[in-house]
Amino acid sequence: MSIPENAIAVVGMAGRFPGAKDVSAFWSNLRRGKESIVTLSEQELRDAGVSDKTLADPAYVRRAPLLDGIDEFDAGFFGFPPLAAQVLDPQHRLFLQCAWHALEDAGADPARFDGSIGVYGTSSPSGYLLHNLLSHRDPNAVLAEGLNFDQFSLFLQNDKDFLATRISHAFNLRGPSIAVQTACSSSLVAVHLACLSLLSGECDMALAGGSSLCIPHRVGYFTSPGSMVSAVGHCRPFDVRADGTVFGSGVGLVVLKPLAAAIDAGDRIHAVIRGSAINNDGSAKMGYAAPNPAAQADVIAEAHAVSGIDSSTVSYVECHGTGTPLGDPIEIQGLRAAFEVSQTSRSAPCVLGSVKSNIGHLEVAAGIAGLIKTILCLKNKALPATLHYTSPNPELRLDQSPFVVQSKYGPWECDGVRRAGVSSFGVGGTNAHVVLEEAPAEASEVSAHAEPAGPQVILLSAQTAAALGESRTALAAALETQDGPRLSDVAYTLARRRKHNVTMAAVVHDREHAATVLRAAEHDNVFVGEAAHDGEHGDRADAAPTSDRVVFLFPGQGAQHVGMAKGLYDTEPVFAQHFDTCAAGFRDETGIDLHAEVFDGTATDLERIDRSQPALFTVEYALAKLVDTFGVRAGAYIGYSTGEYIAATLAGVFDLQTAIKTVSLRARLMHESPPGAMVAVALGPDDVTQYLPPEVELSAVNDPGNCVVAGPKDQIRALRQRLTEAGIPVRRVRATHAFHTSAMDPMLGQFQEFLSRQQLRPPRTPLLSNLTGSWMSDQQVVDPASWTRQISSPIRFADELDVVLAAPSRILVEVGPGGSLTGSAMRHPKWSTTHRTVRLMRHPLQDVDDRDTFLRALGELWSAGVEVDWTPRRPAVPHLVSLPGYPFARQRHWVEPNHTVWAQAPGANNGSPAGTADGSTAATVDAARNGESQTEVTLQRIWSQCLGVSSVDRNANFFDLGGDSLMAISIAMAAANEGLTITPQDLYEYPTLASLTAAVDASFASSGLAKPPEAQANPAVPPNVTYFLDRGLRDTGRCRVPLILRLDPKIGLPDIRAVLTAVVNHHDALRLHLVGNDGIWEQHIAAPAEFTGLSNRSVPDGVAAGSPEERAAVLGILAELLEDQTDPNAPLAAVHIAAAHGGPHYLCLAIHAMVTDDSSRQILATDIVTAFGQRLAGEEITLEPVSTGWREWSLRCAALATHPAALDTRSYWIENSTKATLWLADALPNAHTAHPPRADELTKLSSTLSVEQTSELDDGRRRFRRSIQTILLAALGRTIAQTVGEGVVAVELEGEGRSVLRPDVDLRRTVGWFTTYYPVPLACATGLGALAQLDAVHNTLKSVPHYGIGYGLLRYVYAPTGRVLGAQRTPDIHFRYAGVIPELPSGDAPVQFDSDMTLPVREPIPGMGHAIELRVYRFGGSLHLDWWYDTRRIPAATAEALERTFPLALSALIQEAIAAEHTEHDDSEIVGEPEAGALVDLSSMDAG
């Protein structure tokens, strides 16, 4: 066959078109003349956001060609994290999936393709970006303020320029990767450029096509007189009624190769591209968007010339055919001019068609749609109708041309080779024309060769078990069709596809059997598993070759059985050939007929050693030769006893004849040795020794907990009885002699003398030794004495397994009957989930076909990652056939458009709104995971948020999870906000959470943070405690946090005392004693002891249970408890309150503030309830372990002060400490204020905002994109300005010290006081605008480094800055926003906390010595404000004025900001609140 030099084969194709999920459905619709442009209902249009005004407009056409599932994508398959998938242009998503299907259709696995693959693709401008993603952003911020990282990332995921390179990146393609943009002709131009690339040798295979989606999707369009769109919603090319086109959505691709290369590779060829051409209209036309008939004629004529064909041989043209009154006549004019060049008369008219009548105009994908339609016409030798064609547009003058329009489906009649042209013309003038030809007969027709005899192995794989199940069902359905493909071709086609992690291998006999097997939930002929990966290397290209991972195991005496491998002998010529060769050799040496012994069992006894050992050698040797024909090679051999001779023969130590002689002699001499017996014992070799009689010896160690002993029969019998009486499992081994013991000594001399006369060679494949349990050296292999000692020495099989299982992904193949050796391997301590075992032969009790078992085992090897050459099961001329493509998961990844709010919600930096559209990518991470440090908890949360997943495996590779360089930048930026120093490069060096955590923690260790400096030292107090002792409440014992528990009356004082003892002994901070030493406070931790701080009280008589009087009595006793505490060295005090008869009792706790923060209270609450539950159940109290105690943390604090992250903030704190210009209290109006206040010198004013006022605050938060704390502080600034005066006030704020600058400690379960305190300047002015004031506070809070932890370290621990900062006056006011206090429902549990959860926030006396403490919290839908003040320093009138003015200032601030005409603030983030509070606020924000 002559092959044109410039011919290109179409070897694969795929597409999704309106009304068609794939190419097969597309042809079905074309053949049936189905129009896939649908009418949209009014409800559909309303749901899509179409207004009533538009619906009422008569110019609005309610028609559209639609694609199903444009919001769905298999993100996991392509390695996209959910969040990245959500913002990826759906045009790119569909192109990715169709590209994969096209490669599958071509039988091309890019990973195995020997050559480069190019990509030429196109997509329309991203409507998803413009309509959906950017609707969540202020257009001024996007367009007018310059490019930022988030915007760049967003455009990278959506711009058409990145379509082709995205495919190349996803599939690891190395050829040219070109995005093509010529408007409507783009996808056909892409095909042309791909052909040129193939012809020039730039690539060896190419993908070409286009993707176009109309978004919004389920909407109509507007028409107007003279426009190019149809007023009736039908595209009617060439018809007299043609009034325009209808734009639609679709995607299509073809896979191309040079024709000669495709034929040589045996590819299936759908059609042949004989030539193509492109040009441009230039300016000789009515306008930029108008067509040019002369240019169109030129491009068609040039394509004919390039193809080397005469236009008279073209019998069909797929036209651009838009159905416009202007475009169609011009196109026919150009066609007529191009075809009139021919001087050859035509035998029949040339048929015209346009797929736009079926599916509309697919914009940039229009050309590929026409090309695929035409290829299908060539394959099916038929031409579908051009819909809506009744009579020609007279402007076409078809009667003066060689053309006719196909108006109904019919055969493609042709005298010679079928040829067709495909045109595509773009707005702007780029024209393209491709000449197609039907595939050569030799390539298009399935070979008439008979189906090969015997079963086939069907291989399927998928990324998930669910996808594999869908593939099985779809394949079964395809095989059940009447004209289904040949089974051997199905197996061949599937074997050429790329393999995924979840695999299935099925041994099937015919199509009906295959369908049954595929549909069965379980079947003996099916193996389903996961590919084994090296735990260190995974899928990396530099991982060990699969042959090095494979180890062949050859069983020995005892594995034999009559009929073994009979099915293989009868059906596999290779096996039979090698069996016969060995059998002939053994017949010559021993006179034994192994055919009769093995297959019939009629000769003598296969249990006899002189029969069984030759039989095993013959079967296993033939089996190894058979598996070798399938390309399976091993990197090492282990033989068990006799099996070691088979291993050595295959490794080249013995030639076959020498091996047969050696095994024959060995078997005869062993048979002639004194009889004995053997038993397997469930004990290790050391443990079994104490039970052994004198003449019983260790014979084999198969795994560390099992061994075999051997000796005389009577002594073995006695041993069995003794072991049975001791309860030790013991079982008989099929053996007639005491093998591998000194009982074999008499034969050794004769055997060694024989071997010394034989030639032994070093092995070609490494061997493990039964004798030593390690690798055989060349010297050992060729030494006859070693082989002789093996006979009488114990087999150290467990040690051999110890060696091979040290490699993380070994594949152990038992090459022989049964599965005893692989069974021992799976019991070995080094066995792991990355190891695999495969058994090539059935167990004697299994009633299954030998060949099916063998082929299924080959399938298991393939599943484990071993390359299997399936050629022996292929027909002489295999063919690719059309089979269902990969069943991509249909998971929704979509951001709905937002038509009302432009401002971007925090956390939606990549274009998605706050939260997620479908809930599938919520990134909520539990901060209490076993085995994770605080560093890892934070990194886990950051990774989850950036990847858009709910959790991340700590050992998963960041880049395998879909991470890339841009996401690495996002993670580094997020980590910086958490106080962790990470660079994007760190993720390349440490790509797992575990390794990155270790690296981050190691950086702390380098600064002396990893270990306490002195293990036995009494630690100094941390900075916050120093602050408290230095400047806080004078009667330090009074600073207490109260908790109330309600107890079932059956709980007595012994129970309470036991619980409190357990909790106090569990948490060292609760045993804290402070000791002053020369002006320096030290912490002493008392030894665990019984809790003695429990007193007992009763509710007064006559008070009813549950009454208000009882509540008042309980609160009164609690108040007395708090007042009575004067000693700070009793961190926990408690009182039990016995209530009225039959009513609940109460337990009141008073916890010193020095040992508790919000997290500590949660820990204590959990532990107390847990301890009570265990106590009441009669169990020992066992609480969850504490990884790092308070004492250890305190020892590390000094090192934190010299950490670079803290030292880097020195200038910030020194500068800010001098900014205050206004003080609420006189510095020292009289001497007594130089001392901290006593509890009785503090008083409180309380107020509550109504639910409506609080809602106003929430509305302000949403509108201004500012945190609650920011708004409250701004209102505080206004309040101070109005009541005290204008200036800058220093305000003390709180931070969360647990989660910042984390050393290598785990504080998740540590009880202690980790709250940090730091000052910030607050501007107080009456003339400052509301938005300006909010911005000023926002920027102040945003600038605070590391939640303020560095301030305390530099103030109280680091001496150089301590002197400077200590000279500054303590801020007058302390502000604390405690967030939302939950309401606990009352229940009937025996132990439950008081439902009033405001008590621990509301009641504690301020302890930090400020003139004013403003404590704000949310409860019951209202905002509560507690103003505590030092009566010595703040006049009551001032305090009352502040309390009275604040709500008014807050309301005025919000109203003024709302009334502003525009917002000016930066909405990139909300900072400044305690971490937990910030998360609560963010989660409650509206998506828009």
Swiss-Prot record:
Task: Indicate the segments forming the Carrier domain, all copies.
Answer: 930-1004
Record-annotated active site? C184, H320, H361, S641
Pfam families linked: Acyl_transf_1, Condensation, KAsynt_C_assoc, ketoacyl-synt, Ketoacyl-synt_C, PP-binding
| UniProt-annotated stretches for the region Acyltransferase | 551-868
Question: What EC number(s) does this enzyme carry?
Answer: 2.3.1.292
Pathway it acts in?
A: Lipid metabolism; fatty acid biosynthesis
The knockout outcome noted for this protein's gene is:
Disruption of the pps gene cluster abolishes the production of both phthiocerol and phenolphthiocerol derivatives. Deletion of the gene abolishes the synthesis of phthiocerol dimycocerosates (DIM).
Cofactor descriptive note: Binds 1 phosphopantetheine covalently.
Q: Which cofactor does it need?
A: NADP(+); pantetheine 4'-phosphate
Single biological process term from Gene Ontology:
fatty acid biosynthetic process
Residues bearing O-(pantetheine 4'-phosphoryl)serine? S965
Record function comment: Part of the PpsABCDE complex involved in the biosynthesis of the lipid core common to phthiocerols and phenolphthiocerols by successive additions of malonyl-CoA or methylmalonyl-CoA extender units. PpsA can accept as substrate the activated forms of either icosanoyl (C20), docosanoyl (C22) or lignoceroyl (C24) groups from FadD26, or a (4-hydroxyphenyl)-C17 or (4-hydroxyphenyl)-C19 fatty acyl from FadD29. PpsA initiates the biosynthesis and extends its substrate using a malonyl-CoA extender unit. The PpsB and PpsC proteins add the second and third malonyl-CoA extender units.
Return the protein name. Phenolphthiocerol/phthiocerol polyketide synthase subunit E
Task: Tell me what organism the protein belongs to.
Answer: Mycobacterium bovis (strain ATCC BAA-935 / AF2122/97)
Q: Which gene encodes it?
A: ppsE
